[in-house]
Amino acid sequence: MRKKKKSLTEVSALGQYIPMSVHKARRVIDQIRGRSYKETLMILELMPYRACYPIFKIIYSAAANAKHNKGFEKEDLLVWKAEVNKGPTRKKLKPRARGRSYLIKKPTCHISVVLKDISYYEAYETLYNREKYLPSNFRLKSSGAIWDKK
C-alpha cells in the first residue's frame, strides 16, 4: 500500500457510514466542489436537501482541523476535493402478514472533503508574474490561434 504524501496546504475530513444514498449525497457535493468555504456554507444552508446537513458538518469539521492543526484562516479555504463513495448496505427484516418478512436495504456512504489554503498561491501570483513564465503556446491573447476566430 502506497503512503500518501502530506501536503502543506491541504486539510481533510472524512465522514463514514452516513445513512444516505450515494446519489443523493453526490447531488449536493457536485454543487460545492471548487467553491470557497464561506460560499459553501451559504449554499448548504439554503439547499432544501436532507443530504446537506451531514456534508455541512464534515466541511465545518475540516475547517476546524485547518484552523487548529495548521493555523489556516477560514476565509482562505477552498473546497479542493469532495467525493462520495458507496458504503456497506444495512439490511433489516420487516415483519409481514402470515409469518413472512420483507428485506429492507438501508444504503450508507462515505464522504471525504479536502480543503486547500489558497493564500499561499495568491502570494505566489503577486510575487511572480505567472504569464511571463508560461510557455509560448499557452499565451492565447491575439496570437492568431483558433480561439481568436469565431
Swiss-Prot record:
Keywords: Chloroplast, Plastid, Ribonucleoprotein, Ribosomal protein, RNA-binding, rRNA-binding. It is found in: Plastid, Chloroplast. One of its GO terms (molecular function) is rRNA binding. GO terms for biological process: translation. The keyword rRNA-binding applies. The keyword rRNA-binding applies. One of its GO terms (cellular component) is large ribosomal subunit. It comes from the Eukaryota. Part of the 50S ribosomal subunit. Belongs to the universal ribosomal protein uL22 family. NCBIfam families: rplV_bact. This is Large ribosomal subunit protein uL22c. The lineage of its organism: Eukaryota, Viridiplantae, Streptophyta, Embryophyta, Tracheophyta.
